[in-house]
UniProtKB/Swiss-Prot annotation:
Binding site residues for Mn(2+) 2: 80, 108
Keyword Manganese: yes
Cofactor field: Mn(2+)
Post-translational modification: Phosphorylated on serines and threonines by host kinases, including human casein kinase II.
Function: Plays an essential role in viral RNA transcription and replication by forming the heterotrimeric polymerase complex together with PB1 and PB2 subunits. The complex transcribes viral mRNAs by using a unique mechanism called cap-snatching. It consists in the hijacking and cleavage of host capped pre-mRNAs. These short capped RNAs are then used as primers for viral mRNAs. The PB2 subunit is responsible for the binding of the 5' cap of cellular pre-mRNAs which are subsequently cleaved after 10-13 nucleotides by the PA subunit that carries the endonuclease activity.
Entry annotated with the keyword Nuclease: yes
Entry EC no(s): 3.1.-.-
Assembly and interaction partners: Influenza RNA polymerase is composed of three subunits: PB1, PB2 and PA. Interacts (via C-terminus) with PB1 (via N-terminus).
Protein name (database record): Polymerase acidic protein
Alphabetical keyword list: Cap snatching, Endonuclease, Eukaryotic host gene expression shutoff by virus, Eukaryotic host transcription shutoff by virus, Host cytoplasm, Host gene expression shutoff by virus, Host nucleus, Host-virus interaction, Hydrolase, Inhibition of host RNA polymerase II by virus, Manganese, Metal-binding, Nuclease, Phosphoprotein
UniProt record similarity statement: Belongs to the influenza viruses PA family.
Cofactor note: Binds 2 manganese ions per subunit.
Chain location of the short sequence motif Nuclear localization signal 2 (NLS2) per the record: 184-247
Length: 716
């Protein structure tokens, strides 16, 4: 049969039919009768449209050959043979321009003269049986049905055959010829008997063997077979049934299922108030590094030694001054704390042997900054349960904050490439089985795309800081330990480089439970002037500590160097997750893999190489107010990685809630885009549960703003 199809039909039709079958995971070499049926249906649809035009007076005419310059418009728009996404785009466009109602299923043609969609049917059975099945499935007055059989019979809605006698005769003759050709090769009987009831290629494929047994075993109670259950589901009318079930539950429960239309959803309401502030545990785009290349000093690799070496590369230190005070803090204490760190580093250098770790003096400024002796005294409950007015202390409601532009800039920066490589090839793990050859190839391609990404720098910085802080918290519980913030990378030329971002001073850390908090003071170098976006730096006291000479296209320029100081806190569980930030690489790699898999299953071969090496192809990255943003595959990799990294850096209950609840609304919108006619109840309640997570978190507010852009463009 496969040979017959390839000989009998136009190669373009054969190619389209193969593509359609592969899109739904069916093999033309195995499902040969279905292959023949799809080719036949396509050919009839194309013949239906051939030679039919509308002239400038709006009259329908037949032109088999003639003046190529005549102002003629095709009478029929062909929808059959296009891939699903494009076909729905064409249907939507027709509906928008003509005002015709949108069909539930993809039709085959649109008739511009009669202003209606047409569903073509080709059957090996009785035409009236097939017609009833089609009509029952489509359930639409809008779509005109026209059925042809291989015996020369036809049937159409209201006996309106649309085309002239001669055009229809041409189709019937072609069908009769196909039947004769099949019969002469002994293929007709098998082809005729293989037609089952009305179905679309995506709705039915045979389940056999183990999968069939599993399907029969996993049916809900009271169903004897899979067919039985399918028939029930196909005829299921959700509205009344679900309402009936709800009415049995309680008199208070009342849910009316409302259709979810393009006009139904509204944008999420973002909170007002002062702009949101930076709340990450370390600086991101504003960080400045003091670096040494090809480190080979004594004690190289010991953080304190590396930090001292990096500090010595800078010569522009000056008397520190406060340029942006912290609103609520004692700013002079932050200034004194930095002076103390500088003094203690100089003390270390004067010692004969530099120690591996440095515990610094518990001065009054550090005790204040680290909250020493500030925790309320704990009293055993048994000692105070008789106190009459015992109550939990009042906590303030969180203050609402509005979205600020800096968080979008932070995200854009995280997606960019740096001039250093932050991970080696083996950061994601090694092969353990031969099947993983493709996995290795994907991993290597992916690593090449993201190794220089700024988000990858944030991963390595986060892993280092959290590991060092957790180690110090366990090893020196009572001490105020000085912890350098360090990262390592390779330059373009492959030279090793050690970077110092600043210092952390750890407070007392008797961490018994996962959620017990250790306080720390962070002091980070930066060239960003805090007075440009003071709202971003609400939690910081910023000092000016030096002047840095920078090489620019116009020569050397001097820029002030700042130190961003703040009190912060973390816990064992947060540090544990911070140490595992490399998981972000794995998560984004898996997302890319699922894109490759989708492409590979359509093409029936592994598309990894083409996917990464076809530099001309662009992919959707996300929604912005301008519409769908597209970029290279590298940009997609880096954007997915940056999202994963920001989910880790800005992890919070607000993010958890927003992600879980907004996903429900997203799925409903996707269902609407896929023409699945979703219904909802208590949509207001869903909006409430999403919007109660929009309080003050910058990353959540940015995601909500992206979600609104998506809603705008998805429902156009």
């Amino acid at each position: 049969m496969e040979d017959f199809v390839r000989q009998c039909f136009n190669p373009m039709i054969v190619e389209l039919a193969e593509k359609a079958m592969k899109e739904y995971g069916e093999d033309p070499r195995i499902e040969t009768n279905k292959f023949a049926a799809i080719c036949t249906h396509m050919e009839v649809s194309f013949m239906y449209s051939d030679f039919h035009f509308i002239n400038e007076r709006g009259e329908s005419i037949i032109v088999e050959s003639g003046d190529p310059n005549a102002l003629l418009k095709h009478r029929f728009e062909i929808i059959e043979g296009r891939d699903r996404a494009m076909a729905w785009t064409v249907v939507n466009s027709i509906c928008n321009t003509t005002g015709v109602g949108k069909p539930k299923f993809l039709p085959d043609l649109y008739d511009y003269k009669e202003d209606r969609f047409i569903e073509i049917g080709v059957t090996r059975r009785e035409v009236h049986i097939y017609y009833l099945e089609k009509a029952n499935k489509i359930k639409s007055e809008e779509t005109h049905i026209h059925i042809f059989s291989f015996t020369g019979e036809e049937m159409a809605t209201k006996a309106d055959y649309t085309l002239d006698e001669e055009s229809r005769a041409r189709i019937k003759t072609r069908l009769f010829t196909i039947r004769q050709e099949m019969a002469s090769r002994g293929l007709w009987d098998s082809f005729r008997q293989s037609e089952r009831g009305e179905e679309t290629i995506e709705e039915r494929f045979e389940i056999t063997g183990t999968m069939r047994r599993l399907a029969d075993q996993s049916l809900p109670p009271n169903f004897s077979s899979l067919e039985n259950f399918r028939a029930y589901v196909d005829g299921f009318e959700p509205n009344g049934y679900i309402e009936g079930k709800l009415s049995q539950m309680s008199k208070e429960v009342n849910a009316r299922i409302e259709p979810f239309l393009k006009t139904t959803p509204r944008p999420l309401r973002l909170p007002g108030g002062p702009p949101c502030f930076q709340r990450s545990k370390f600086l991101l785009m504003d960080a400045l590094k003091l670096s040494i290349e090809d480190p080979s000093h004594e004690g190289e690799g010991i953080p304190l030694y590396d930090a001292i070496k990096c500090m010595k590369t800078f010569f522009g230190w000056k008397e520190p001054i406060i340029v942006k005070p912290h609103e609520k803090g004692i700013n002079s204490n932050y200034l004194l704390a930095w002076k103390q760190v500088l003094a203690e580093i100089q003390d270390i250098e004067s010692e004969k042997k530099v120690p591996r770790t440095k515990n610094i003096k518990k001065t009054s400024q550090l005790k204040w900054a680290l909250g020493e002796n500030m925790a309320p005294e704990k009293v055993d409950f048994d000692d105070c349960k008789d106190v009459s007015d015992l109550k939990q202390y009042d906590s303030d409601e969180p203050e609402f904050r509005s979205l600020a532009s800096w968080i979008q800039s932070e995200f854009n920066k995280a997606c960019e490439l740096t001039d250093s490589s932050w991970i080696e090839l083996d950061e994601i793990g090694e092969d353990v089985a031969p099947i993983e050859h493709i996995a290795s190839m994907r991993r290597n391609y992916f690593t090449a795309e993201v190794s220089h990404c700024r988000a990858t720098e944030y991963i390595m910085k986060g892993v280092y800081i959290n590991t060092a802080l957790l180690n110090a918290s366990c090893a020196a519980m009572d001490d105020f330990q000085l912890i350098p913030m360090i990262s390592k990378c390779r330059t373009k030329e492959g030279r090793r480089k050690t970077n110092l971002y600043g210092f952390i001073i750890k407070g007392r850390s008797h961490l018994r439970n996962d959620t017990d908090v250790v306080n720390f003071v962070s002091m980070e170098f930066s060239l960003t002037d805090p007075r440009l976006e003071p709202h971003k730096w609400e939690k910081y006291c910023v000092l000016e500590i030096g002047d840095m000479l920078l090489r620019t296209s116009i020569g050397q320029v001097s820029r002030p160097m700042f130190l961003y100081v703040r009190t912060n806190g973390t816990s064992k569980i947060k540090m544990k997750w911070g140490m595992e930030m490399r998981r972000c690489l794995l998560q984004s790699l898996q997302q890319i893999e699922s894109m490759i898999e989708a492409e590979s299953s359509v093409k029936e071969k592994d598309m990894t190489k083409e996917f990464f090496e076809n530099k001309s192809e662009t992919w959707p990255i996300g929604e912005s107010p301008k519409g769908v943003e597209e970029g290279s595959i590298g940009k997609v990799c880096r954007t997915l990685l940056a999202k994963s990294v920001f989910n880790s850096l800005y992890a919070s209950p607000q993010l958890e809630g927003f992600s879980a609840e907004s996903r429900k609304l997203l799925l409903i919108v996707q269902a609407l885009r896929d023409n699945l006619e979703p219904g909802t109840f208590d949509l207001g309640g869903l909006y409430e549960s999403i919007e109660e997570c929009l309080i003050n978190d910058p990353w959540v507010l940015l995601n909500a703003s992206w979600f609104n852009s998506f809603l705008t463009h998805a429902l156009r």
